[in-house]
């Protein structure tokens, strides 16, 4: 008990210092000002399906600088996507990123870095279309890549993620 009280006091002091430092880091100064930027919006497009269309509409409402991004892990999928894009792509540009090792993260991070260089302090919103299956065990089978990408993008400065969910009707 004699040791516990001083240890608790030290822990509480550390926590207090953390909150004071956090408050100082977030405090506005006269030099701070709101600067409107043209946000770039990237809609991840693994394929063209009903879950992607609401994501494209959402992205168009955020900015005039919208691009659909497909990471090429299978050339057959790319050809089908390109064929269907003119009909269903809503006039948005489609950017295809090569991924020789079937990695989603590395090509996307490299492209985000390129986009951020286009304008100083440009924010990038990455829209991740997801479909929500009606049964819990179906959810275990889908959207795992989206979860991994959201986790990686969480630690990228100037990058915001947005999920657009499409709720599937009951399926077998």
Label every model-predicted segment.
Residues 3-7, 15-172:
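Cytosolic C-terminal regulatory domains/tails of membrane transporters and channels
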